[in-house]
Swiss-Prot record:
DNA ligase that catalyzes the formation of phosphodiester linkages between 5'-phosphoryl and 3'-hydroxyl groups in double-stranded DNA using NAD as a coenzyme and as the energy source for the reaction. It is essential for DNA replication and repair of damaged DNA. HAMAP family: DNA_ligase_A. PROSITE patterns: BRCT, DNA_LIGASE_N1, DNA_LIGASE_N2. InterPro entries: BRCT_dom (IPR001357), BRCT_dom_sf (IPR036420), DisA/LigA_HHH (IPR041663), DNA_ligase (IPR001679), DNA_ligase_AS (IPR018239), DNA_ligase_CS (IPR033136), DNAligase_adenylation (IPR013839), DNAligase_N (IPR013840). One of its GO terms (molecular function) is DNA ligase (NAD+) activity. This is DNA ligase. Keywords: DNA damage, DNA repair, DNA replication, Ligase, Magnesium, Manganese, Metal-binding, NAD, Zinc. It catalyses: NAD(+) + (deoxyribonucleotide)n-3'-hydroxyl + 5'-phospho-(deoxyribonucleotide)m = (deoxyribonucleotide)n+m + AMP + beta-nicotinamide D-nucleotide. It comes from Staphylococcus epidermidis (strain ATCC 35984 / DSM 28319 / BCRC 17069 / CCUG 31568 / BM 3577 / RP62A).
Length: 665
């Protein structure tokens, strides 16, 4: 079991690092397929050994950060990603898990459109706001650009309040036309329709977006309170009736064999479509069964995305470059002769670690096979031995850090080489980049290039130095005009007000993720109280394991860290928790902790208003009646939900009874 525990800890380290590089830095060091593989491994371990699953596990994260070109807006409910399946075995495991949980099941199969996920909000039947997915929690407001898409109705037939989600995409014909125009104008063409769609929707001038001829397929309703659907297929049919564009190639199947037949059909037919797809989405069709299965923090348990097999090409490995991460891990990266893979030109691919290089016998000068698992980030699959040059040599990682010259070490149980010098320049810079990221101190405008300049000009050596920067420090930097400097200084000043959990996460304490930072901040409230905490005390807290407890205490006992905190405090950086404590949330005694379903037409308020009020009282409002539903509030013309409530013996209230409870009568 000790070996399993060490592997879980290693997977946590790797996945957190890769997620940070990809979603926060926008500078991934590994291919998406490697991340998916490691995540898949961790999921399987956690399923087999539930005692090793923690609330800050990478399997509950949703990685990723919204761009800054448009206003950032929080989603009413998170836009979760889907779990991935890459082969028949993965799909059969998913099916078995579903049937073990809810018994007999019917699936809805839908094409996975290769575009940009969007969320559209309607109030009284009018389109009022459109957001990108962003990091799943916060998206970009691209309403004006979405209004230019003719497939999105600006007003629907009924005065409903809801949010509908889907995929904006560029049809292949529009893509070809756009790239022809760009080439004629001497501009760089887009690599693929997906990039073109994303770039078009991020145009600040909506007139330019309008010229791009985008379209959209809608695939889910976020809040079915005002809908009558009891299945995914019925929900899509209702969207059709309201005037929305849904994908008509969907198919309802009775079992996993039907799913496999659907995948086989579209694997061969995908080229005949007028738009790109990168897989198939499989969902449990019955909405009450979806409700029963629920969600992880990362994805719904009742759906999965099958990814089409990756395209493979051959190119030459020109060199191996090394990079050092925030935790000191040294990662080798293949420098490749540029080659087109799945629509984009690839010139770099991660080699992960020395063990993988030796296992695959990859050498500089080799002809290598490259693929994009998931059609996103490239990886080196293998060398082609019969093309190997006679003078090739086995590659060996250096013995000393390429940044600071300190001796590299391999910690027992790990495959990575690490630089353990706390003053290593590369690590310090990566730590600074982490500190200013959105989930940490969220200092908008302080990007990677500026941090490099500040460090190289000896203007910052640690995170506290950021708060001592002045206008005269910033103005001489490259591409830093007066307005940009003023905005950056305002962002730095604003970040001082961040709640304690953001500071804790930003400090980069080993093993301390976003969730655990929140737990510690809420429990201890101030940095002063955290300084007094003991390892044995931390271990008693749910979600804080032995390794994290030891890491936190060791970090906070360090005299250099205490000096750093004092330096931050001297610049009035907030050291207190500003959120609402879980224990302080009080709701209406008749509703708090209850699972409630609204159905039918209410006279005194809309169902949306009733839903919001109930949530404020601590109730959980769901769309489907299940055996776990506590109360069904039925208005006029209540349909199948009322019938199901009667079948289950669920408590049923009229609107009048609900209002009496509201008023305490």
């Amino acid at each position: 079991m000790q070996g399993v525990k060490k592997r879980v800890e290693k997977l946590h380290d790797l996945l957190n690092q890769y997620s940070y590089e990809y979603y926060v830095q926008d500078n991934p060091s590994v291919p998406d397929s490697e991340y998916d593989k490691l995540l898949h491994e961790l999921i399987e371990i956690e399923e087999k050994y539930p005692e090793f699953k923690s609330t800050d596990s990478p399997t509950v994260r949703v990685g990723g950060e919204a761009q800054s070109s448009f206003e950032k807006v929080n989603h009413d409910t998170p836009m979760l990603s889907l779990g991935n399946a890459f082969n028949e075995e993965d799909l059969r495991k998913f099916d078995q898990r579903i049937r073990d949980s809810i018994g007999k099941v019917e699936y809805m199969c839908e094409l996975k459109i290769d575009g940009l996920a969007v969320s559209l909000k309607y109030e009284n039947g009018r389109f009022v706001q459109g957001l990108t997915r962003g990091d799943g929690t916060t998206g970009e407001d691209i309403t004006e650009n979405l209004r230019t898409i003719h497939a999105i109705p600006l007003k629907i037939k009924e005065p409903l309040n809801f949010e509908v989600r889907g995929e904006a995409y560029m049809p292949r014909r529009s893509f070809i036309h756009l790239n022809n125009e760009k080439e004629q104008n001497g501009e760089q063409p887009f690599a693929n329709p997906r990039n073109a769609a994303a770039g078009s929707l991020r145009q600040l001038d909506s007139k330019l977006a309008a010229k791009r001829k985008l379209s959209v397929f809608l695939y889910s309703v976020n809040d079915l309170t005002e809908f009558n659907a009891t299945t995914q297929s019925e929900a899509l049919e209702e969207l059709d009736q309201l005037g929305f564009k849904t994908n008509q190639e969907r198919e309802r199947v009775s079992d996993i064999e039907g799913v496999l037949n659907y995948i086989e059909k579209w694997t061969s037919k995908r080229g005949s479509l007028s738009y790109d797809i990168d897989g198939i989405v499989i969902k449990v069709n019955d909405l009450s069964q979806q409700e029963e299965m629920g969600y992880t923090q990362k994805s719904p348990r009742w759906a999965i995305a099958y990814k089409f097999p990756a395209e493979e090409v051959i190119t030459k490995l020109l060199d191996i470059e090394l990079s050092i991460g925030r935790t000191g891990v040294v990662t080798p990266t293949a420098i490749l002769e540029p080659v087109k893979v799945a629509g984009t030109t690839v010139s770099r691919a991660s080699l992960h670690n020395e063990d993988l290089i030796h296992e695959r016998d990859i050498r500089i000068g080799d002809s290598v096979v490259i693929k994009k698992a998931g059609d996103i980030i490239p990886e080196v699959v293998k060398s082609i031995l019969d093309r190997r040059p006679n003078e090739s040599e086995i590659y060996h990682m250096p013995t000393h850090c390429p940044s600071c010259g300190h001796e590299l070490v391999r910690i027992e149980g790990e495959v990575a080489l690490r630089c353990i010098n706390p003053k290593c320049q590369a690590q310090l810079i990566e730590g600074l980049i982490h500190f200013v990221s959105r989930q940490a101190m969220n200092i908008d405008g302080l990007g990677t290039k500026i941090i490099h300049q500040l460090y190289e000009n000896q203007l910052i050596k640690d995170v506290a130095d950021i708060f001592y920067l002045k206008e005269e420090d910033l103005l001489p930097l490259e591409r830093m005009g007066k307005k940009k400097v003023d905005n950056l200084l305002l962002a730095i000043e604003k970040s001082k007000e961040q709640s304690l959990e953001h500071l804790l996460f930003g400090l980069g304490i080993r093993h301390l993720g976003v969730k655990a930072s929140q737990v510690l901040a809420e429990r201890y409230e101030t940095m002063d109280q955290l300084f007094k905490v003991t390892e044995s005390e931390l271990i008693e807290i749910q979600d804080i394991g032995d390794k994290l407890a030891q890491s936190v205490v060791t970090y906070l006992e360090n005299s250099d860290i205490r000096s750093l905190i004092e330096k931050l405090s001297n610049k009035n950086v907030n050291m207190s928790y500003k959120g609402i404590k879980t224990t302080e949330i009080e709701g209406h005694p008749d509703f708090s902790g209850k699972t409630i379903v609204l159905t039918g037409k209410l006279e005194q308020m809309t169902r949306n208003e009733a839903s919001e009020w109930l949530k404020m009282q601590g109730a959980k409002v769901t769309n489907s009646v299940t055996k776990s539903t506590d109360i069904v509030i039925a208005g006029a013309d209540a349909g199948s939900k009322l019938a199901k409530a009667e079948k289950y013996g669920t408590e049923i209230w009229t609107e009048a009874a609900f209002i009496e409870k509201q008023n305490g009568i």
